[in-house]
């Protein structure tokens, strides 16, 4: 048998063959995956703020260090001598001299579109999609709230389907929730229990242009300008969004929001329980939540009814994330992202939220406050999206919005309801399946 002698150019040929195969594979991946199934897209408007932002300015208040965003639509593009383009108002402390510079500008959020999903399965409620608008065919992003064949109503900011309120799943609540940057947590005594509790009130500052505090030249202490303190108002939580502060929202489209969420980190000490009180407007009896790590139970009292759920074992050396949601007339309690209690509510809840440690009754106010602050961290209040009857600039309905959705059509809304042009205002109200481009990957 003669020995095999490869051609001298065989290694070069093999390298070229491998390169050609690699190029073909890359082209196929780009064509069928990146360009076909996962298409990049840049959000171009504020209609889905704050979940998805269009062009915006990212700012930080020099007074309270709160980070916030505003849209860029009404900003001048240039200013002389490196001066600020404009001044913004902090949504937390109402300081009205937050400078806006050109280098704070950001493009819209970059998202990916799953183009194959609309052809593989039906679109689900609360999903966000890219589609062509029925009036002019423009590409835009909205959220699906109404499905084919349903009768949809908008009442008091909520979505009703076939006469029943539609509760968002917990994951959707976390995706859609909007931070409430204003408000104060204050210590007060509960008359019924004699305990001091930490209560939240949506107190706002009147917009002001001078700092509340000024550092002394000779020390690290600060002086407060008492003669120039802004007045505070207890205004309540509303559907106003700081991104829209330069648009001048119609007064008729400003509404109080009762669908709130409280989140905090709890580091329990031994078996000491934690209580959360919510005010019930109708019965004037508080809804009480008692977290008891000693016997691993959560007890919930609503009017004359008492419910009990299992509480997971909570390590005392680690903080645990607690979420209490009142979205869509439903009480949801989660610990470390796991739901432990859900119950529909027939009552209206009013602020304040109030936290206390029942085992501290013999302690002074200062000692109780210290114990609460030692165990409770990162207190934050959120609100749900409030859907208005119509966007600003359109006549509002007198009672509620109602529509029946045809077959193979969908009803879509933007999260920034006051300034979203969507199914409420399009001449051709509904979006068909064939107009949908793909599902948004947030």
Regions found by a protein language model. Name each.
Residues 1-442:
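Extended hydrophobic leader/signal-anchor segments used for secretion and membrane insertion
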